[in-house]
Amino acid sequence: MAEIIGIDLGTTNSCVAVMEGGKVRVIENAEGSRTTPSIVAYTKDGEVLVGASAKRQAVTNADRTLYAIKRLIGRRFDDNVVQKDIKMVPYKIIKADNGDAWVEVKDKEGKSQKLAPPQISAQVLIKMKKTAEDYLGHEVKDAVITVPAYFNDSQRQATKDAGKIAGLNVKRIINEPTAAALAYGMDKKKGDRKIAVYDLGGGTFDISIIEIAEVDGEHQFEVLATNGDTFLGGEDFDLRLIDYLAGEFKKDEGVDLHNDPLALQRLKEAAEKAKIELSSSQQTDVNLPYITADASGPKHLNIRLTRAKLESLVEDLVERTIEPCKVAIKDAGLKVSEIDDVILVGGQTRMPKVQEAVKNFFGKEARKDVNPDEAVAIGAAIQGAVLSGEVKDVLLLDVTPLSLGIETLGGVMTKLIEKNTTIPTKANQVFSTADDNQTAVTVHVLQGEREMASANKSLGRFDLSDIPPAPRGVPQIEVTFDIDANGILHVSAKDKATGKEQSIVIKASSGLSDEEVEKMVKDAEAHRDSDRKFHELVDARNQADAMIHAAEKSVKDLGSEVSADEKSAIEKVVNELKEAMKGNDKDAIEAKRKALTEHSSKLAERVYAKKGGAAGAPPGGEAEGEPQAQAGGKKEDVVDAEFEEVKDEKKKDEDK
């Protein structure tokens, strides 16, 4: 069976891994890095950049450079957290027709283009897919993609949509802490252990309590409880620092950098760099010359930042991670002292203040033998190998992070599946009508822990109609909830009297209909096609350039031996080729290059013959004519070798 790759689709960085010969390998991207920035940029000439290249041009293209998109995936525009983000990012977040949070960028014609978060995330997944394909040497179709454990149903569905748009068959969506536990637990000694995975990434925080046990020779990974906050991560730490630096600058210079997208982007980069530096040093300087200007001239930002200052700015963010830890331990039915190991995942856990908070809560040092940037992708690759049958002794028992239920009389949420229930799972309950002769019921599906229906996340609603008229409380409507291994919910309602049934796969709030997803798949494929054509055009230009250089060199080497007619004929073809290279017609460039090749190959033969004679051939026309005759008798593909010969001879002359 073909490999199933593991992808950690992160808020800040993404990573891809694959299992080969029983070992997991994290794959380096084209730039040689094991992680890729989850950044997508749309340039003014219509190119789509992903990763390091997108990050590099962010300062000069701030409103078209999209980062931290994972914070918007599966979210409604009116969510408080989205509204907060709108004020903080240089790109434009808009309300889609269905109420979801989308992004608006200008295309190369300057027209507004609306993009759904799964569509943008798909570009990162395409890069991850290509990275794996370049390494493996063949096409990759199947993947396991990770999501934060505390992602709700619509966020999971939106992630699956992103995979589909990227041309991937998403075999499984698994939780990031569970993946990290797989990476940690696979090579550990036998025996039961209870571990806490503390995952503080770029945009989300998760805590999972996982029991690793040996059951009949199998590694069993059972998630006992999970908790978290899907809008708390390294980006929030950066924002605190950006606000502080902007505030200090405003105090000193009277200019608010929040109003200048270019300055804000430079400040973001500097804040991120300073935060990372302060994990290993006690102080750093944030130095940004010419950050902005006013009537009095250019302004420079130069602020000394200490680790203590940074820690005081983010103290409450670190503290916010502890409450979910308490809840998860309680839900798992354990005491803190019963946790054997603590694993840190996510780049933000490198901050000493975070490590100290974890140590104080769990009463032990976190393990350092797990790479916080790569563990999740490694775990996803292991799960991929389990699904493909390459690994046979692993059983993964994950849970649903939030309770699921429906709205009942009085605006109450009635839970059918409690949080931390092992998945896949199925539950049903019988409900009835609220009014006499009621012929239809609306099933409103909710996810969350609050008693009030309105305080929970609405996942979707559907109607069951044609119920025979009867007094209230008489009809029996059986509602069934079925969660698959991806944590995605299927709901059905059945009238027991008539057998009539209505069902729904919860995807309404992921915002994308099947038609929209299909359209985005086609768009992505078209984009891949245009990318391929672009690369072919660049290759054609490069080959043409090399041919022009070779022809001009031959003319120069032969000097006065080239007749005026020959020279003008070659110059004419060279000029025509240069003109073709300015355009975008690959075939025209190829045709002109071939014409130049025909002209220059004759010159090349003469250069070769001349050099051959100079290299010590016996005097006389016969010896000089031999290489000429041979070269003339052979096909064009010999021409390259002839040029090599010239270079070698030149080098020998230089060495002398």
From Swiss-Prot:
Comp. bias (Low complexity): 620-632
UniProt lists compositionally biased (Basic and acidic residues) regions at 647-656
Phosphothreonine occurs at which residues?
Answer: 204
Q: Which GO terms describe its molecular function?
A: ATP binding; ATP-dependent protein folding chaperone; unfolded protein binding
Looking up InterPro entries in the UniProt record yields:
ATPase_NBD, Chaperone_DnaK, Heat_shock_70_CS, HSP70_C_sf, HSP70_peptide-bd_sf, Hsp_70_fam
Q: For this UniProt entry, which segments traverse the membrane? A: none
CDD domains according to UniProt: ASKHA_NBD_HSP70_DnaK-like (cd10234)
Alphabetically list the UniProt keywords: ATP-binding, Chaperone, Nucleotide-binding, Phosphoprotein, Stress response
Start and end residues of each stretch annotated as Disordered: 602-656
What superkingdom does the record give? Bacteria
How is this protein induced? By stress conditions e.g. heat shock.
For this chain, the family text in UniProt reads: Belongs to the heat shock protein 70 family.
Q: Which NCBIfam families match?
A: PRK00290.1, PRK05183.1, prok_dnaK
Role noted for this protein: Acts as a chaperone.
HAMAP family under this entry? DnaK
This protein's name: Chaperone protein DnaK
Q: Which organism is it from?
A: Coxiella burnetii (strain CbuG_Q212)
Task: Show the taxonomic lineage.
Answer: Bacteria, Pseudomonadati, Pseudomonadota, Gammaproteobacteria, Legionellales
